[in-house]
Swiss-Prot record:
Function: Mediates homophilic cell-cell adhesion.
Lineage: Eukaryota, Metazoa, Chordata, Craniata, Vertebrata
Gene3D superfamilies named among the record's database cross-references: Immunoglobulins (2.60.40.10)
Any Pfam family: V-set
Parts of the chain on the Extracellular side: 32-158
Disulfide bonding pattern of the chain: 52-128
Subcellular location: Membrane
This protein's record includes keyword Glycoprotein: yes
Domain of life: Eukaryota
Membrane topology classification: Single-pass type I membrane protein
Sugar-modified residues: 123
Full protein name: Myelin protein zero-like protein 3
Length: 235
């Protein structure tokens, strides 16, 4: 009976130890952490960057590998589009041929790639997998890519912003110019009624003021011409 009790006590004592080892094992298994953007939006013909970063408890060696895969919408089939091990190996077949570029740096924990000349057909889910032995088990983040055309609304917003930057200052200048001209006209009428005659100094000041007003008017015209040219280039 005493032997059974001793064996039972030893067995019970093993449970806390196994628990510690188990939790330590879980910590080691997930010591490689990978992060990527959940959603990325791009436009047709404009280069898109798919960002992926990782943190590993082990030093980076030539055994580190990076794999990017692509899954089309409404499909369970995935295809490899990029592989890295000491050197980058973008896919040489399929729709992504000659369009995948390496823009990462493994020594900085960056496993990002870019897609050139994207099209609407590139919409889908991209996955980034990193293995850095002995860290080989990790989460697999997924990025949902949405590629669209730059529509009229996007161009219109750019034109609206340009209009605000050009027209608002011009409107302020014109308003100030009109106020000054109105005050000057009112003063001239008042002086003409009272038979007042200007001195040579006042005549000189009026000439300088007229030149300043003419300069401001030319500035407004230049701003309007600049806006017209930018608007034509946009469309």
């Amino acid at each position: 009976m005493q032997q059974r009790g001793a064996a039972g006590s030893r067995g019970c004592a093993l449970f806390p130890l196994l628990g510690v080892l188990f939790f330590q094992g879980v910590y080691i298994v997930f010591s490689l952490e990978i992060r990527a953007d959940a959603h990325v939006r791009g436009y047709v013909g404009e280069k898109i960057k798919l960002k992926c970063t990782f943190k590993s408890t082990s030093d980076v060696t030539d055994k580190l590998t990076i794999d990017w895969t692509y899954r089309p919408p409404s499909s369970s089939h995935t295809v490899s589009i990029f592989h890295y091990q000491s050197f980058q190996y973008p896919t040489t077949a399929g729709t992504f041929r000659d369009r995948i570029s390496w823009v990462g740096n493994v020594y900085k924990g960056d496993a990002s790639i870019s897609i050139s000349n994207p099209t609407i057909k590139d919409n889908g889910t991209f996955s980034c997998a990193v293995k850095n032995p002995p860290d080989v088990h990790h989460n697999i983040p997924m990025t949902e890519l949405t590629v669209t055309e730059r529509g009229f609304g996007t161009m219109l917003s750019s034109v609206a912003l340009l209009s605000i930057l050009v027209f608002v200052p011009s409107a302020v200048v014109v308003a100030l110019l009109l106020v000054r001209m109105g005050r000057k006209a009112a003063g001239l009428k008042k002086r003409s009624r009272s038979g007042y005659k200007k001195s040579s100094i006042e005549v000189s000041d009026d000439t300088d003021q007229e030149e300043e007003e003419a300069c401001m008017a030319r500035l407004c015209v230049r701003c309007a011409e600049c806006l017209d040219s930018d608007y034509e280039e946009t469309y």
